[in-house]
Amino acid sequence: METNRQKKIGSVIQKDLVDILQGEVRKNGVSNLVISVSKVSVTSDLSVATVYLSIFPQEKAKETLEGIKSNTTLIKHDLSQRVRLQLRRVPNLVFFIDDSLDYIEKIDNALAGKENPIENRDLLDKRRKS
């Protein structure tokens, strides 16, 4: 269970990370790429922030995530410059791809199909935790 402080820090980080990532996409002249930060969860000791990204189009998601992971220190520095008046110490950032939209789409497609996935549980993949 997240405390109010964790939620507030997560929302501050989320808002500023969106600006940083979208600014880098625009600055590098990459077209047809949308990066959104769907969720940021902060550990109880405020040392690690887990960032879930939705990247569209899905085909560029893995390579974009690798680029973001390789530039984590620069992103953290930019973030610390933006939130220096709100946070004493910026948590370490860990990035993951948010696959919840894909999972929801698979469920919708399975429910619209001929066989019922509620009766036959083998139709849907097990969701993996990241």
From Swiss-Prot:
Coiled-coil positions: none
Entry keyword set: Cytoplasm, Ribosome biogenesis
Gene Ontology CC entries for this record: cytosol
Annotated localization: Cytoplasm
Pfam family, one: RBFA
SUPFAM superfamilies: Ribosome-binding factor A, RbfA (SSF89919)
Chief location bin: cytoplasm
Biological process annotations from GO: maturation of SSU-rRNA
An MF annotation (GO) of this entry: ribosomal small subunit binding
Subunit structure of this chain's protein: Monomer. Binds 30S ribosomal subunits, but not 50S ribosomal subunits or 70S ribosomes.
Purpose of the protein: One of several proteins that assist in the late maturation steps of the functional core of the 30S ribosomal subunit. Associates with free 30S ribosomal subunits (but not with 30S subunits that are part of 70S ribosomes or polysomes). Required for efficient processing of 16S rRNA. May interact with the 5'-terminal helix region of 16S rRNA.
Similarity comment: family membership: Belongs to the RbfA family.
Protein name, per record: Ribosome-binding factor A
Organism: Flavobacterium johnsoniae (strain ATCC 17061 / DSM 2064 / JCM 8514 / BCRC 14874 / CCUG 350202 / NBRC 14942 / NCIMB 11054 / UW101)
